[in-house]
A protein has these predicted regions:
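C-terminal "cap" of GNAT-fold acetyltransferases
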Residues: 3, 100-106, 137-152, 156-184
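A short helix/loop element that forms part of the nucleotide-sugar donor recognition site in Leloir-type
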Residues: 6
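Acetyl-CoA-dependent GNAT
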Residues: 3, 11-13, 22-28, 32-118, ...
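A broad helix-preferring feature
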Residues: 18, 83-89, 140, 159
Length: 184
């Protein structure tokens, strides 16, 4: 009788069924739907108003149409469905203000996996791809204070906390950095 595959084999096979590719304008409705699926469970327990603000500001069709030409964006597809995405690029190309930063930074702005597809290695694959496509010797990212799962995920993959940006109204942003290249 054939042996049943282990959980590790199943996970590896499920991850192998996932393809990564650059996002296009045709993906915008799927990106919005991904945001609706992943943003509320991620940030709602931290601050429900903040979760809604994120969706309204950063996950709209207009915002994606504006950022796609300026930011590098990857999607992960499984069975023809967009199940995850990541965006990254230079801090100076962003529309946001970062008064605490001098100089420029390579930043991964987003890494989001649909909750039905967590734990299959998709986030790790996207992160590795972003690291390999990043020009420069370090990669930065922000984690919202209280997003412990994401924080632990990044620390286990070589990121270290550098600074915290406080905001009276909203949760703090914690900036993490990972050396790339030889120290990867
Ligand atoms: C953090 C996140 C990107 C990780 O993606 P993923 O595809 O689930 O990650 P992987 O399968 O590659 O790796 C899973 C790792 O994350 C941990 N993990 C986090 N959430 C998990 C879940 N729901 N199920 C299983 N593992 C989970 C595991 O401990 C595992 O770590 P290990 O491999 O060191 O044991 C994903 O959980 C996510 O999209 N979270 C919500 C959005 C978010 O917080 N994004 C980051 C914004 S800064």
């Amino acid at each position: 009788m054939a042996e049943s595959p282990s959980a590790v084999d199943v996970r590896a096979q499920q991850c192998a069924e996932v393809t990564l590719r650059p996002a296009t304008v045709d993906d915008i409705p799927a990106l919005r739907a991904l945001g609706e699926a992943v943003v509320p469970p991620t940030y709602g327990p931290i601050d429900a108003a903040y979760a809604q603000r994120m969706l309204d500001e950063w996950w709209t069709a207009e915002r994606f149409a504006d950022t796609l030409p300026r930011v590098r964006m990857l999607v992960a597809e499984r069975d023809g469905q967009v199940v995850a995405m990541s965006s990254f690029g230079r801090l100076s190309a962003s529309h946001r203000d970062f008064p605490h930063v001098t100089g420029d930074r390579e930043v991964m702005w987003k890494l989001y996996v649909h909750p039905d597809h967590h734990g299959l290695g998709i986030g790790s694959r996207l992160l590795a791809e972003v690291e390999s496509m990043t020009e420069g010797d370090e990669l930065w990212l922000e984690v919202v204070d209280g997003n412990v799962r994401a924080y632990d995920f990044y620390v286990s993959r070589g990121f270290r906390e550098v600074e915290r940006v406080t905001d009276r109204e909203w949760p703090d942003d914690i900036w993490l950095r990972k050396p790339l290249g030889g120290a990867r």
